[in-house]
Amino acid sequence: MVVAAQGIESTSSEIIKLRDTELYPQLLELIKGLTCTWRSMYEAHQVQTHIVQQLKYLNTVPSIESTSEIHRQATLQLELQVQQWHFSFCNIVKAQRDYIESLAGWLRLSLFQFSKNTMSRTSEESKIYSLCEKWHHAVDKIPDKVASEGINNFLTVLGGIVVQQGEEHKQSRRCESALKEFEKRVYELKAIESKYSTYSTLGATGNDPVKEKRVKVESLRAKAVEEKTKLEKSVSTTRSITMNNLQMSLPHLFQAMVGFSSVCMHDFESIYNQQSNKKEHDDVKRIQQ
């Protein structure tokens, strides 16, 4: 029994040693790394915000050209990438929360279990406990919902653009089909006119094949013009929806990301500086003793 107790005590002491001499410095370096990461993200999102804010000064000449297949595929690819961005963003926030929650939970258990008197923790225990508690509090209050909604709203905008481009593509095919049918009937009309040009086409019933063909061709001409007008309107709608929605949604998106990354950067920087100052203070005290 005594041997078992000594073994447990030895193991506990080793865990405490690893926690204080190995885990704590690594966590501090991780916090420092997260500070640098979010500072880089903050600076990048600031630049992106400045760029997209210039969209309101962009004057474009309305194009009558239909959206190309390459353009449509690029829009679909952008939508896919933003979906992945939203998924990855939500995952990384959840992973950070899960990580620090598990770490803080384990630390609380280890402090209560390994320390006979929880009110008299050593300075090393206090440092790692303080670090994890502040970290836990920081990730709990970061404004990830605002940033997530910003990405999701932009995704909705892209979805609307994709739908409109699809409608335009359908109208383009209808226009092309109407034009081909019209051209086909014009060719047939010319053939009939050439065939019956040398004599009267009126039969016993008084029917005129050429006249009937001309009526049909005129009907198809009107149909082709109508479909072309619809296509031009659809192209104009696509351009308007794309430009207006991007001008409105992109600044909101990157402003949300600037806000999120700013909070993360400052929170992690504050935690790191506080813990580093504590470490320097403790080092000075050891030297003076």
Model region roles, listed by residue range:
Residues 1-289:
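Extended alpha-helical coiled-coil scaffold domains characteristic of the BAR superfamily
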